[in-house]
Amino acid sequence: LEDRRLVELFNRYGIRGTFNLNGGLPRPERIPESEWVELYKGHEVACHTYHHPTISRSPLDQTARQVLADRMQLEGVMGYPVRGLAYPNGSWTPEIAALLPALGIRYARVVGDTHDFAMPHDFMTWKATCHHTHNLLEDGKRFVELYKTQYLYMMYVWGHSFEFRTEEDWALMEQFCQLAGGREDTWYATNIEIVDYMADAARLQYTAAGDKVCNPNAQSIWVEVDGRHYEIPAGKTVALV
């Protein structure tokens, strides 16, 4: 139920979120499905398995069933393909990670903090920068002070809205949103938007001379050349001069 307050806070400061839901758990203390579409508008709904089992101890075929059942339940409500996952209880194995693409999953978040801002090397074992109770403001201050444009920086905060037990917890998150939100130099994106954008960026087609680039994708991609920024619109070829 705390998702309602958290989404309102995110919306106020322009923060985007990904919300991992279990389609098969009882709902007396959970937000009813009838509210999902409106509540999570502008954010992403992603999988967390159907019943939240410890999947590293489950048969692989039953893990597949958990993921697909959750996808189908969430997609039936949200009306779009659900392509992300947070491992339940942080439980995973290399075999599970290798299985997920065949189940339509493009990324999966593990438990733990990096306290770093680098892009992940493997989106199937995506570790966040920090939990919302672990150096949130300290990491946030370091993030907004970054300035080297030759790197791709990302700050990713994970956690659970039910862990906000006191007004002090909510005040801390609002401080972070005030610090990090509404910045013109920051793209506020959901998990799947980041994954899709990076995949599309990798598909850009450059001339051998490096003076033109074609974008075969369905969204604009931005590149920087010699300090100048170029928007490469979908389906267009742009001269980099």
Regions found by a protein language model. Name each.
Residues 1-5:
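Short acidic, Gly/Ser-rich segments with clustered Asp/Glu that frequently serve as metal-coordination loops
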Residues 6, 70, 140-144:
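Generic hydrophobic alpha-helical segments
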Residues 12, 27, 75, 107-116, ...:
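C-terminal domain-boundary segment and adjacent tail
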Residues 13-106, 112-130, 153-161:
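Metal-dependent polysaccharide deacetylase catalytic core of the NodB/CE4 family, i.e.
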Residues 31, 58, 135-138, 168, ...:
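Short coil/turn linker and secondary-structure boundary residues
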Residues 60-65, 137, 167-170, 174:
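Non-membrane alpha-helical structural segments and their capping/turn regions in soluble enzymes
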Residues 131-146:
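A Trp-anchored, charged/polar loop motif used as the substrate-binding/catalytic surface
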